[in-house]
Amino acid sequence: MSPNSKELEEKLDPRVKRTRSLILQAFGALLAEKGFEAISVQDVTDKAEINRATFYKHFVDKYALLDYTIKELFKKEIEKRTLDACHYTPENLRSLILAVCEFLSRLHNECAQPHQQFESLVEGTIKKQIFALLSHWLEQSKSRIPIEIPATVATWAIYGLASFYSHSTLARAGGAREKRPVLEKFVEEALPLVAVNLEQFAQRV
């Protein structure tokens, strides 16, 4: 079966949707309970009340499940702000930075003990989506300069800043912790650092 046929079947068959929804719900609950590294496929199938053969019809392993989960959640975050239907403007870039900061913060708050492996997998998935969105924006410009470099630089900058924000609870003397910077203020300070890499490439025709 071709990928397009499989995609069409999944869209039409409510049983496929229901089973995938059960898997995603079970996986989300397990991420909050025990963290990605400790989760096994058996844990997911037990919680979703399906057998392993059914799981493998949807995902090859737990890594593919994590990739799909993060991709879909972040896609909804982008679509909620209609950024996928926009072109480059400083305000749209600001909304994108805000979306990534909020998404990573929520992910770190909701997932138990996010270790390095989990962090790396999430980073790779989200960076691909940021890069695709920035490339889409830049492709609408009149610049003849290849867009790969500015899109890559901006992608790393956005993710790095959002990661810093989501982890920025700094230890103080006596074990107390500082709160994260106020998000709106943080984004306003971060925006020029990212925009400087894009402005010259993003002029509209």
Where are the model-predicted features located?
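Helix-turn-helix
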Residues: 30-64
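Solvent-exposed, amphipathic alpha-helical segments
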Residues: 22-34, 76, 80, 84, ...
